[in-house]
């Protein structure tokens, strides 16, 4: 379940 959250956080950080 944290997989999706981690992916989202990474996307936001990169942005």
Swiss-Prot record:
Pathway participation: One-carbon metabolism; methyl-coenzyme M reduction; methane from methyl-coenzyme M: step 1/1
Catalyzed reaction equations: coenzyme B + methyl-coenzyme M = methane + coenzyme M-coenzyme B heterodisulfide
Principal location: cytoplasm
Biophysicochemical property: temperature dependence: Optimum temperature is 60 degrees Celsius.
Enzyme type, top EC level: transferase
Influence of pH: Optimum pH is 7.0.
Enzyme Commission no: 2.8.4.1
Cellular component annotations (GO), alphabetically ordered: cytoplasm
Keywords: Cytoplasm, Methanogenesis, Nickel, Transferase
Cellular location(s): Cytoplasm
Cofactor(s) named in the record: coenzyme F430
One Gene Ontology MF term: coenzyme-B sulfoethylthiotransferase activity
Quaternary assembly: MCR from M.thermophila is a heterotrimer composed of an alpha, a beta, and a gamma subunit.
Function description: Component of the methyl-coenzyme M reductase (MCR) I that catalyzes the reductive cleavage of methyl-coenzyme M (CoM-S-CH3 or 2-(methylthio)ethanesulfonate) using coenzyme B (CoB or 7-mercaptoheptanoylthreonine phosphate) as reductant which results in the production of methane and the mixed heterodisulfide of CoB and CoM (CoM-S-S-CoB). This is the final step in methanogenesis.
Similarity field: Belongs to the methyl-coenzyme M reductase alpha subunit family.
Protein name: Methyl-coenzyme M reductase subunit alpha
Organism: Methanosarcina thermophila
């Amino acid at each position: 379940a944290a997989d999706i959250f981690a992916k989202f956080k990474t996307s936001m950080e990169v942005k």
